[in-house]
């Protein structure tokens, strides 16, 4: 037999299960005629356990009119059996729980004679059991508690909303789904349309926060004390370094003051040297300076007449021999140069030899030259040599 069930066979199986459910739901229960476990056919017991009895089981050899009348009265659907199988009343049905469809033949119900042992496969029995349970549970309404739809609020629900507990409907096995609240109008089990699922809150939302650390990773008090001790020692070392830098700063300040004092002394000595030896500021010889200040031609340009003027007078004079000559120029008289006082310069140079020359031999040589000097130029040469030796 093919292990895969076709779509038509599945539909017939579902309709058969629905008819079985309607039959047991509509039929009255009689305790005296209830089936016991001993009277149930082996192999069909899992399907019929927990169901009411079914009355007037039709045998395959029953008449067509009796089956039709009982099937219409009890809600059981009649099934047409092929003529080839109708004559064999004692033969076993290969699939006892499947609905058999065909054209013509004897009409019989889906229930088999208890005396006939079924030879159907276990897969067919299980499929029949599953289809029957689903059809029965589909039309059995259970009291359901509707889940309240809470409105979303920013920041999470309040204290009152958090205190409420949401009761969920338990599902025992293959129970009815809580998503549909209306009973289906189709007896074939087909879903006409799907209802829109409303947003349901399955559980109470929890506020999101930082999870506390596990107690296993908590530090002991001794570890904390050791860490604090290490940090304290580190800070003490830094403080010692800062204090050491403070003493160094004081030393730098003292050295800086010494440098300033030395610089002031050098500046004073340089000022003294400038006063004693002014010299030529430009370093240009005197002859060049006189040449630059000599007479030169001056050109006057611009509008207007420039009257001619001559520095010489047109008067002629007679010399000693009565010769006409121009006005004689007076002879230049050289002015005697004043004698400069060299005594003060010698005293200043003697003081410089004493302060600036440390070598006794050089000091003695400068004193001898100073005693022999009689002109200003000689004194200036001695002064320059003293300054050079000091540098």
Curated annotation (Swiss-Prot):
Multimerization, as annotated region: 216-279
Pfam families in alphabetical order: Paramyx_P_V_C (PF03210)
Bias (Polar residues): 54-65
Keywords assigned: Coiled coil, Phosphoprotein, Viral RNA replication
Region Disordered, residue ranges: 54-97, 148-185
Top-level taxon of the source organism: Viruses
Similarity comment: Belongs to the rubulavirus/avulavirus P protein family.
Domains (record comment): The N-terminus consists of a long intrinsically disordered tail. The central part contains the coiled-coil multimerization domain (MD or OD). Forms a four-stranded coiled coil structure. The C-terminus constitutes the alpha-helical X domain (XD) that binds to the nucleocapsid (N-RNA complex) and the L polymerase.
Task performed by this protein: Essential cofactor of the RNA polymerase L that plays a central role in the transcription and replication by forming the polymerase complex with RNA polymerase L and recruiting L to the genomic N-RNA template for RNA synthesis. Also plays a central role in the encapsidation of nascent RNA chains by forming the encapsidation complex with the nucleocapsid protein N (N-P complex). Acts as a chaperone for newly synthesized free N protein, so-called N0, allowing encapsidation of nascent RNA chains during replication.
The protein's name in its UniProt record: Phosphoprotein
Organism expressing this protein natively: Mumps virus (strain SBL)
Gene giving rise to this polypeptide: P/V
